[in-house]
Amino acid sequence: MKILLICHDGAQLDQVILARWLSSFSNLVGIVIIQEPPSLLWRRVRREVKRIGAFRFLDVLALRLYYRIFLSGKDQQWERQELREKCFIYGDIPSRTAILETPSPNTQETETFIRRLNPDIVLARCKVLLKESIFSIPSKGTFVMHPGICPEYRNAHGCFWALANRDLTKVGMTLLRIDKGVDTGPAFGYYTYPFDEVHESHIVIQHRVVMENLDALRSKFLEIFSGTAAPLNTSGRPSAVWGQPWLTKYLQWKSHAKRGRQ
């Protein structure tokens, strides 16, 4: 089973841990490392302002600032510990693994790189929507570990919005096969863990729904490769796209969570 990983430069849990994990049960033929130019950040900012308005975007920025001041230190400590533990479990990737550094996963260079390696499966751990010319290359499909339960919590922050909405049975990750839509492809599994919404941040919860389920995910990828995995039936369920987290919703969530413990 040949697998290729797409991830962002500096995303250590993906670039290091998931790469080692994939290599432990498959032939990790390549890694596409995305090094985005600053212009893409401003493009995302303009798109989000247009979508939710300038006032609500201040709410988004307020949470970013709050997180950096009050939460990021503890989360970075958790990530360092996770890296140490998982690097002890999973050995380094082979030196033969091909590496491509690119500003975008949708370039012609990336397409040529993936076609040359001819993976059976691509695991895309990136914020960028992939072109069909990219995600259609692997014979078994391109998959994402979506941070949210689909179809109810589509887009990049589904775990946060499920927590903020007190929809606690929908806090988890969906293994999706990419199609032409935004998180609309067939789901092959839901994954969660006994999260602590009082003491853990939404970022840690979003990471742990993946990291606590690596054994189960390994089994699922092997089923997908062998052709025995069937997509879940999600017909008739509500579908919604969610945006960036807000500070007001974060504070409401934590307040509800703490009251629930009393």
Task: Walk through the language-model features, giving the residues of each.
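One-carbon transfer enzymes
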Residues: 1-262
